[in-house]
């Protein structure tokens, strides 16, 4: 009976350890605020500068940033902070005022006028 309990305990422990294993090529997506191709370049560069980010592509229309990440080397929170530090908001991390204020005039995505101007350009 003790052997059965021991075997079950070992199996449960191995299952819980494997469930916590971080992936080498995890696919991650998040929304990032921005309005133009300059924003795209800045957002992708900020993400790629994080250790462990292998691929970054931001869609101007949908604001979706798709990433391939080595979860053993970085976290989503670290990537979001890097993007915020260059002036772009994510759902969980807002850009500091000084970072947002340093953006080029056409990249001020919080300004409704700028958003409307970019919508007209896309049509």
What residue ranges belong to the model's regions?
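Conserved short beta-strand edge segments in small beta-sheet-based binding/regulatory domains
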Residues: 87-99
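Bacterial Sec-dependent N-terminal signal peptides
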Residues: 1-24
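Short glycine-/aliphatic-rich beta-strand segments at the starts of folded cytosolic domains
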Residues: 22-34
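Short, thiol/selenol-centered motifs that function as redox-active sites or metal-ligating centers
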Residues: 33-47, 105-109
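Short secondary-structure boundary/hinge segments and terminal tails
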Residues: 65-66, 96, 100-102
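Short, low-order "capping/linker" segments at domain edges
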Residues: 100-122
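Processing junctions and N-termini across compartments
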Residues: 13, 30-33, 100-101
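N-terminal, post-signal-peptide region of Sec/Tat-exported proteins
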Residues: 40-82
């Amino acid at each position: 009976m003790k052997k059965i309990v021991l075997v079950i305990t070992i199996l449960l422990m191995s299952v819980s350890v494997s469930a916590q294993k971080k992936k080498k090529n995890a696919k991650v997506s998040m929304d990032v605020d921005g309005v133009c191709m300059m924003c795209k370049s800045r957002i992708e560069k900020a993400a790629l500068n994080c250790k462990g980010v292998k691929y970054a592509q931001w869609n101007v229309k949908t604001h979706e940033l798709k990433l391939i990440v080595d979860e053993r080397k970085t976290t989503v929170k670290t990537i979001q902070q890097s993007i915020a530090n260059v002036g772009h908001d994510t759902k969980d991390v807002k850009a500091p005022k000084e970072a947002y204020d340093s953006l080029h005039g056409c990249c001020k995505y919080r300004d409704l006028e700028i958003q409307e101007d970019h919508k007209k350009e896309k049509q």
